[in-house]
């Protein structure tokens, strides 16, 4: 048995997002976003046809939820402001009901000793802006900067930790390469432009925050999937893994921390003649406006081998033209989500930030496991005994602790998520929360065994294992 103690004032908590938790009520003034729209078009694409209007009803239950956060040991909590709730058309008029809701929500958190961390964009493009191209359009960058400035003005007295994007690679992958987010295109030229505009928008908002006299910190949340070559002694596998890393990790990590794009990526997009449209002064903006704080979402690694399968010319070019995914035998799996569990990956990411990214201040902003059918684990008192989740978090925290001991500037750990929430097209198929949500009983909340356990970890600022 070993005692793992974390640094003083360590952030213990969880993360969620507006579109995955808030739900809608008839007179809330919220505008349409791409998820509302896609669900209206194709409800059958969503598990059990549960759409974004339902979710976990945080809009009306947030006071109860904050008490449950307190009961589960949170000292910090991240959510996002829904752009389409605050500014229903994406630009123009502000919805005062949204202002009241978010101010009340953030105040409730603070009054209960929980610091709100607020993300500005979580895959939820307002529909009127998507109809003009979404992140493909320069207009969206300008609209986003105005929206962010409104958020800083309206909530800056309550919120001191801001994030420009959550997982900005996901709208690129889902919306413009692999068809799991609206608008479901397959077009690498568009994907490059979308990623470029997201990076530019982030830098512009960071500049606005720093120049606005605000007294907090601003960063970005990136899902980092370390790319491991099949054979570290095979130069072709190593090269393929480096390219995958440039596409999926460094495309946002390098601009956010170093103010520049990875050379491997620049060479590929130049060679393919799919360079984004760049305006004069853009690259200086990106170079000069880097983050204060990095949020790291870690779920799984990426296993890569040199390209062996034929290139699919129907959709060429694609990132996958440069590598194949490697199905490593005997890996540990979460069978419900189909994801590999590789705890050391979290240590490798943190070590990378220390060795190659100036030991930037960072925290684990998401880590967790989704499990289907958790009602199987309900005990006689109605509590879900999710020992598998406790084991998952413990095993990852051991590696976080090791990285900190070695000098990594990691200041917190947030699990995904607080209460079971709506996971996009998967809806409520896989449950991730410390707190169960019973959709059949009007979203009734029950703390799981992991939530009670997490409170002891937070109170002791560590654990024995």
Predicted regions span which residues?
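Active-site region of glycoside hydrolase catalytic domains
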Residues: 1-46, 89-91, 99-465
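Aromatic- and Gly/Pro-rich amphipathic surface segment
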Residues: 32-67
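N-terminal, well-ordered alpha-helical segments
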Residues: 60, 67-70, 100-103, 107
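Catalytic domains of carbohydrate-active enzymes, especially glycoside hydrolases
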Residues: 61-82, 289-293
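Glycine-rich, proline-tolerant flexible connector loops at the mouths of alpha/beta enzymes
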Residues: 81-94
């Amino acid at each position: 048995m070993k005692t793992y103690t974390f640094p003083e004032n360590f952030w213990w908590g969880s993360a969620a997002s507006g579109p995955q938790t808030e739900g809608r009520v008839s007179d809330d003034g919220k505008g349409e976003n791409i998820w509302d729209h896609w669900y209206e078009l194709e409800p059958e694409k969503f598990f059990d046809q549960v759409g974004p209007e339902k979710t976990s009803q945080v809009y009306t239950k947030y006071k109860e939820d904050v008490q449950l956060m307190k009961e589960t040991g949170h000292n910090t909590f991240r959510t996002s402001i829904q752009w389409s709730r605050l500014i229903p058309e994406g630009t123009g008029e502000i919805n005062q009901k949204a202002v009241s809701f978010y101010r009340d929500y953030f105040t409730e958190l603070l009054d209960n000793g929980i610091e709100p961390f607020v993300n500005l964009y979580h895959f939820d493009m307002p529909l009127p802006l998507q109809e003009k191209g979404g992140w493909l359009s320069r207009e969206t960058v300008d609209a986003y900067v105005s929206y962010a400035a409104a958020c800083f003005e309206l909530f800056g007295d309550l919120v001191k930790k801001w994030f420009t994007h959550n997982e900005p690679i996901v709208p690129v992958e889902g919306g413009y390469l692999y068809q799991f987010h609206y608008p479901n295109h397959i077009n690498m030229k568009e994907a490059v432009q979308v990623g470029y505009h997201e990076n530019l928008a982030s830098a512009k908002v960071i500049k606005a925050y720093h120049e606005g006299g605000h007294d907090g910190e601003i960063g970005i949340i990136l899902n980092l999937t370390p790319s491991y070559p099949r054979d570290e002694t095979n130069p072709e596998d190593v090269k393929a893994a480096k390219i995958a890393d440039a596409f999926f990790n460094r495309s946002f990590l390098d601009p956010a921390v170093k103010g520049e794009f990875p050379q491997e990526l620049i060479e590929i997009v130049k060679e393919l003649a799919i360079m984004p449209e760049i305006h004069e002064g853009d690259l200086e903006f990106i170079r000069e406006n880097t983050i204060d704080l990095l949020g790291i979402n870690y779920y799984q690694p990426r296993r890569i081998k040199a390209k062996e399968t034929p290139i699919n010319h129907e959709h060429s070019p694609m990132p996958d033209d440069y590598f194949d995914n490697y199905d490593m035998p005997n890996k540990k799996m979460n069978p419900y989500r189909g994801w590999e569990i590789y705890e050391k990956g979290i240590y490798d990411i943190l070590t990378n930030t220390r060795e190659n990214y100036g030991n930037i201040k960072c925290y684990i902003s998401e880590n967790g496991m989704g499990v289907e059918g958790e009602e199987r684990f309900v005990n006689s008192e109605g509590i879900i005994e999710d020992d598998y989740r406790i084991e998952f978090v413990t095993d990852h925290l051991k590696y976080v602790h090791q990285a900190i001991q070695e000098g990594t500037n990691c200041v917190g750990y947030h699990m995904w998520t607080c209460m079971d929430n709506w996971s996009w097209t998967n809806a409520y198929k896989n449950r991730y929360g410390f707190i169960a949500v019973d959709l059949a009983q009007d979203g009734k909340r029950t703390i799981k065994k992991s939530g009670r356990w997490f409170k002891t970890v937070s109170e002791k600022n560590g654990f024995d294992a």
